[in-house]
A protein has these predicted regions:
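Aromatic- and glycine-rich beta-strand/loop motifs that create alpha-glucan
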Residues: 1-18
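Alpha-helical transmembrane segments of multi-pass membrane transporters/translocases
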Residues: 17, 306-314, 371-413
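Secretory targeting signals
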Residues: 26-89, 138-219, 240-320, 364-365, ...
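Short hydrophobic, aromatic-rich alpha-helical segments embedded in or entering the lipid bilayer
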Residues: 349-373
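Cytoplasmic juxtamembrane regions at transmembrane-helix boundaries
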Residues: 230, 314-335, 408-413
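Residue-level recognition of transmembrane alpha-helices
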Residues: 21-24, 242, 331
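Transmembrane helix segments
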Residues: 33-34, 321-357
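Short helix-to-coil transition segments within interhelical loops
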Residues: 229-235
Length: 413
């Protein structure tokens, strides 16, 4: 234990480490503020004027509007909302046009528009997947079989996207059949809030990699390794201690930073909206059987696993290479490779099995949860979020073992 404390103290004495940790905490606050600042709405006043609300004021005003639509998403409520929408459009014209009265939009459209979110998808063209216009949907077609119709749309989507893989189609339908219905809606929190959780995890991963790069390679450069090698605990035990100290620092930093980040978001947007079903914030045919509060927990857990897997790869490179700069450059390439692979080739094994596969932008874990990507091998199909988690878990242990092994072999050499 004393060796562990000494190693942790050594890491924290580095000015570079302290600066990077401070940046991590500052980013936690700054990146939580951004999606809050993006919120905006125009409020009509009794005297006919309009007040533009932004930030917390806009969020509070929207929360008051959304209260009337909170609850279970039943076919009857969707039908009623659609009838109201169509009635307003027939009387005042398209909602998107400038001539649509703001007072009517705020009173009759805004509170219920999220109830209508899934209708264009549900009634989409089965061949092209193009969503239906809300004015073309007959309210009488929204009946007790609404959720069965959603499942039919998922079947059409999977048939188009996984045409040659019936196993993937079947697995998606089976997963969708396990969802708890009717869905629940309490509007309030934006997609941006969840996107910025993922962005923050990406920046945390970069900062952790920057700190971890010098764990072993830094001592190779200074020659300190030659001195430590002559001590009683300068072999395997020292390698394990260094890795444990690094992991402890990164876990604490990650949890503190992400907790502060999420607490700021939840304080601003409220916690009632976290009861909303995943499908009511993203796509009506999404597969995860979770609400937005559970989504936050899953993103944190998956992000921590991916960060640790990426750091373990960096520690292996640090034990293998002779200078910190080389380690850092290779580690950054490995960290960003899934992002570029996904942009270039879409969902492939390369973009999902690397340690940082769940970290990034289009390729991040949230995007995979909201998508319908399946990887196929032989007659088997695997949903990409499962592949990412399993791969990261395996790589965490494999790269940690390789880091210890490489450090010991370096000593023998």
């Amino acid at each position: 234990m004393w060796l562990f404390r000494l190693e942790l103290k050594r890491i924290l004495k580095s000015r570079r480490t302290l600066i990077l940790l401070a940046i991590a905490l500052l980013l936690s606050v700054a990146m939580a503020y951004l999606p809050i600042s993006f919120e905006g709405i125009n409020r009509p006043n009794k005297d006919g004027t309009v007040t533009e609300l932004n930030g917390l004021a806009a969020i509070k005003y929207k929360q008051d509007l959304y209260k009337t639509s909170a609850g279970e998403v039943t076919p009857d409520r969707i039908k009623s909302a659609l009838e109201t929408y169509q009635s307003c459009v027939r009387e005042y014209g398209p909602v998107e046009e400038e001539g649509f009265p703001l007072a009517v939009f705020i009173e009759k459209i805004v509170p219920f528009r999220h109830l209508l979110m899934g209708l264009p998808e549900t009634f989409a063209d089965p061949l092209t997947g193009i969503g239906a216009d809300l004015m073309d949907i007959d309210p009488n077609d929204i009946d007790g079989a609404y959720y069965e119709k959603c499942a039919e749309h998922l079947q059409d989507v999977m048939r188009n996207e996984q045409r040659e893989n019936e196993t993937a189609q079947q697995k998606a339908l089976e997963k969708y059949s396990e969802l708890d219905t009717p869905f629940y809606l309490h509007s309030g929190i934006s997609k941006d809030a969840f996107d910025y959780i993922e962005f923050y995890i990406l920046f945390l991963a970069i900062l952790c990699v920057a700190i971890a790069a010098s764990t072993f390679a830094g001592e190779y450069q200074t020659g300190g390794d030659s001195i430590l090698r002559t001590t009683k605990y300068g072999h395997k035990q020292l390698a394990i201690t260094k890795i444990l100290a690094a992991f402890t620092l990164f876990v604490v930093t990650f949890l503190v930073g992400i907790t502060v980040h999420i607490l700021i978001l939840d304080a601003a947007f409220g916690t009632d909206c976290l009861k909303t079903s995943f499908q009511m914030r993203y796509s009506i045919i999404n597969l995860p059987n979770i609400n937005l509060g559970q989504l936050q927990i899953i993103l944190v857990a998956a992000g921590l696993l991916s960060v640790l897997a990426t750091v373990s790869c960096t520690l292996f490179l640090s034990a293998k290479c002779k200078d910190t700069l080389t380690v850092l450059l290779i580690s950054i390439v490995v960290l960003l490779m899934p992002l570029f692979a996904y942009v270039a080739m879409g969902a492939t094994w390369l973009s999902t099995i690397l340690p940082s596969a769940g970290i990034g932008m289009q390729n991040n874990f949230l995007s995979q949860l909201a998508d319908f990507n399946y990887l196929n091998i032989g007659g088997m199909s695997f949903w990409t979020p499962h592949v990412i988690l399993i791969s990261a878990g395996i790589e965490l242990f494999v790269f940690t073992f390789l880091a210890i092994h490489s450090y010991c072999r370096h000593q023998v050499a």
